[in-house]
């Protein structure tokens, strides 16, 4: 069973010089001009299989208890290495 979902969004805006800043001599009239554009897209493909452990091993390569042990080992190594 496989399903596929695709989503995309985009936004665009233009920023121009504020006339109050120019009239108060805070910035020069030709110094401010900017354009920004943002876009985002996401695709989700899901596949399920009950007989194969490989997808689980790819998604979660290290369990949390081994992650905690590795973090503690790194912290102890740092303390011993710096001589604290």
From Swiss-Prot:
Transmembrane segments: 66-83
Keyword Membrane: yes
Keyword Endoplasmic reticulum: yes
Name assigned to this protein: Uncharacterized endoplasmic reticulum membrane protein YMR122W-A
Lineage, highest ranks first: Eukaryota, Fungi, Dikarya, Ascomycota, Saccharomycotina
Bilayer topology term: Single-pass membrane protein
Keyword terms: Endoplasmic reticulum, Glycoprotein, Membrane, Transmembrane, Transmembrane helix
The species this protein was found in: Saccharomyces cerevisiae (strain ATCC 204508 / S288c)
GO cellular component: cytoplasm; endoplasmic reticulum; endoplasmic reticulum membrane
Protein location: Endoplasmic reticulum membrane
Biased composition (Low complexity): 34-54
């Amino acid at each position: 069973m496989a399903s596929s979902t695709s989503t995309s969004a985009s936004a665009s805006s233009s920023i121009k010089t504020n006339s109050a800043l120019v009239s108060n001599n805070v910035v020069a009239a030709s110094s401010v001009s900017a354009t920004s554009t943002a876009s985002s897209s996401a695709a989700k493909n899901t596949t399920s299989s009950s007989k194969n452990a490989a997808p689980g091993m790819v998604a979660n390569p290290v369990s949390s208890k081994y992650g905690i042990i590795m973090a503690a080992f790194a912290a102890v190594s740092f303390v011993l290495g710096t001589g604290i």
